[in-house]
Amino acid sequence: MDPPRDIQHFKRNIASRSTVSSCSSLAMEIKRKKIRESMFFPSEDCDIKEKMEFEMRMRAGAYKLMVASTKKEQVLDASRSLLTCNARIKAYMSEAQKRTGHQDFRRPSDSQGQVPCKGKVAISGLRIPLFWKDSEHFNSKGNTQRVAVFCLMKIGSEIFDTEMVIADSSMTDICFEGVKIFSEVKPDFELTFELYICGLDEEATFANTPKKLARKLRSSFGRSSGRKLCPLLDGGDPDTFLQSNPIPPGARYSLLAYTTLGLEQAEGSFQSHSLIILQNVEASSWLPLYGNLCCQLVAQPDCMTLDMMSGFLSQQQSIEGLQRRCRLYCVLKAGKISCYYSPEEIQAKVEPILIIPINKETRIRVVENDHQRPGSRLNLINPGNGDSASHVFIAESPDVLQEWLDSLWQHIYDQSQWQHTCDKLMEIDVLSPRKPPLFLTKQADSVYNDLSIGSPGKFESLTDIIHNKIEETNGRFLIGQEEETEPPHWAALFEGSRPIVVQKTVLSPGKESNRSITSPDTGSKKKRRAPPPPPDKLPFTSVSTNQEKENCKGPKPRAGRPSLDAKFSAIIQQLQKSHTSTRKNAPLGQIETGQQPEKRAEESDLPEYTKKEYIVDPQPPVPAPRNKLRMSFREKMNPKAW
């Protein structure tokens, strides 16, 4: 039989320090937490080791590329990658040492402290103004010193670099495009900005003496001893790597200027910051800096972008002395509690029915339970200019109430640490804003918008467009007739409000006969072609005198064509000219003044005032015979035959 276990019971005293028995359940929970922490930190260490191995491989590849490159720009770009990889390796090594030290001295009481939430920091629109002399900037003839410039930005172990930019005296400022976003940033962050420079006109001569010496040392030792020596020569330490793999002087970058930005500089707009310029650097004379850095620094705390707490709460309302409860889905985010009827309203982007601000002025109280009103109640009071607004919520259980209390106090603490960045959410632009163009160019699809076609995106051939237009107008489009305008408003003539030009219509037997001939008759058969006119008679020319006299004072109203007719008017005129050129017409002449046609008996009986409105026309002209070699309509519309 097992001996009975020694069980000790302790009572917690608030005044004295509480002790925990090794056999109690709380002690077992603490042990489990330590085991979880010991399992968690090796995974973080493995993550850092993987990052270090990746940067080491990138560094080796960058050095090989630098040695194999023949162009100076490629050598400088590879040297930039090599410098960035070394900086990241140093940051990972220091981060691993910090985590190892924190793991050794970690205590359970340390986790009880209040820690602010993390966030994101983005920097964009980097612009460095230059201060050239007038003689160097305006009188440069291509003999100026060119330099390669790039930037490094660091927050903790996160390091970003920019692209390499070639600068000369013709540039007024150096611009770097793109946005660099740092994640998992604390509110007391320090963003270090460094500007590196290298001359482009210097020759890069590689000195491989240390590498040759290392190879001789490896070959002089045995195979086993050489393997042990290889990690020492090609270790992860950046200084050791640069000793065995030196960078040529012509491709070696130098730190020219630096600055440090913090939470106070995160305004969300473009600001100018001072740069600390190193005067003892030889390259400081190559690039005259104005001494400022223009950029946009944005900070986004997690409490402004993530839901810090969410769940159902019952709001207690008093309507005309009656108490009622309304169950609402509440979300704590961005300094306020948004209340909805259901979580689906958030996905549907429905406006919340109630918004309660949460800030340092908000008073949070817990109302004690009573027999008449069971349940844990939470009272939120926001004092204002007048009456203070009070909202009472009832939680489902004391545990839920405690979670909401912890989240509310944590949210207020996060706002106090992130300061002005919690007043309004700062947006992070995906692309850095660029300079606007000097001249605004026209859009490429504006030509299709000018055409009066039903669908601008529909690609049709010229023949199809004209054929469809002819079918819509029943052939009037090809003949060139104007569209009929609306009849004039005769009521306006008697009112006298608008001037109207009245025009008489001159009728002649020749025109009536021509209309009867040219009018389509679907029921009759095809008529026989008329014979050519005799050579001794001249063709007919109509003369209208009364019409010209009546219309000489007022302009003749012209019906407007649609935009498509205006587009293809030149094409139709060309088609009509080609059509008339194929006919064999007789030479035209003019009617002599002495030759007057005989008047008909019917016209002699008309009164004098009717004779003024009519003009007696001679015999109508006889059309010329058509050419036998007549082209079809599709042959005329073919652009190859033009």
Swiss-Prot record:
Region (Disordered): 505-563, 575-642
CDD domains xrefs: PH_rhotekin2 (cd13249)
Superkingdom of origin organism: Eukaryota
SMART domains, sorted: PH
InterPro entries (alphabetical): AHD, Cytokinesis/Rho-signaling, HR1_rho-bd, PH-like_dom_sf, PH_domain
Domain PH: 306-413
REM-1 domain: residues covered: 30-105
Keywords for the protein's UniProt record, in alphabetical order: Coiled coil
Ranges of Basic and acidic residues composition bias in the record: 597-615, 632-642
GO process annotations (BP): hemopoiesis; positive regulation of cell population proliferation; signal transduction
UniProt-listed PANTHER family: ANILLIN/RHOTEKIN RTKN (PTHR21538), RHOTEKIN-2 (PTHR21538:SF21)
UniProt-recorded name of the protein: Rhotekin-2
